[in-house]
Amino acid sequence: MASQSQGIQQLLQAEKRAAEKVADARKRKARRLKQAKEEAQMEVEQYRREREQEFQSKQQAAMGSQGNLSAEVEQATRRQVQGMQSSQQRNRERVLAQLLGMVCDVRPQVHPNYRIAA
């Protein structure tokens, strides 16, 4: 009986060691999965930062040329507005005189299609 009891004890100890090994293996697997997940997350973040930086540089290049274009357009617009204002100042008196002349000098005329009924 003692040998059976000793055999059972050995089996229980072996089962306990096996359970511990399985638990350790599961813990190692969980740690490896967690580490792999963290590494993948870091790679994703690094890739995202690289793409964002690339996008920002391309956007700056595009906006820089567009900024120069808008400055040129604004300058041309200012020149045109100044030209129109100076033209208005030069021709103001002449246009007012012409307008007043047309309003005040009324010349009554009979319309060419009017027929005098006899």
Curated annotation (Swiss-Prot):
What does UniProt give as GO cellular component? clathrin-coated vesicle membrane; melanosome; synaptic vesicle membrane; vacuolar proton-transporting V-type ATPase, V1 domain
Cellular location of this protein? Melanosome; Cytoplasmic vesicle, Clathrin-coated vesicle membrane
From which domain of life does this come? Eukaryota
Q: Which InterPro entries match?
A: V-ATPase_G
Keywords for the protein's UniProt record, in alphabetical order: Cytoplasmic vesicle, Hydrogen ion transport, Ion transport, Membrane, Transport
Record GO terms (molecular function):
ATP hydrolysis activity; proton-transporting ATPase activity, rotational mechanism
* Record membrane topology: Peripheral membrane protein
Region annotation Disordered: where it falls in the sequence = 26-90
Q: Where is the composition biased (Polar residues)?
A: 56-69, 78-89
- Can the keyword Cell division be found in this entry's annotation? no
Disulphide bond pairs: none
Q: Which NCBIfam families match?
A: V_ATP_synt_G (TIGR01147)
Q: Which PANTHER family match?
A: V-TYPE PROTON ATPASE SUBUNIT G 2 (PTHR12713:SF13), VACUOLAR ATP SYNTHASE SUBUNIT G (PTHR12713)
Protein name as it appears in the record: V-type proton ATPase subunit G 2
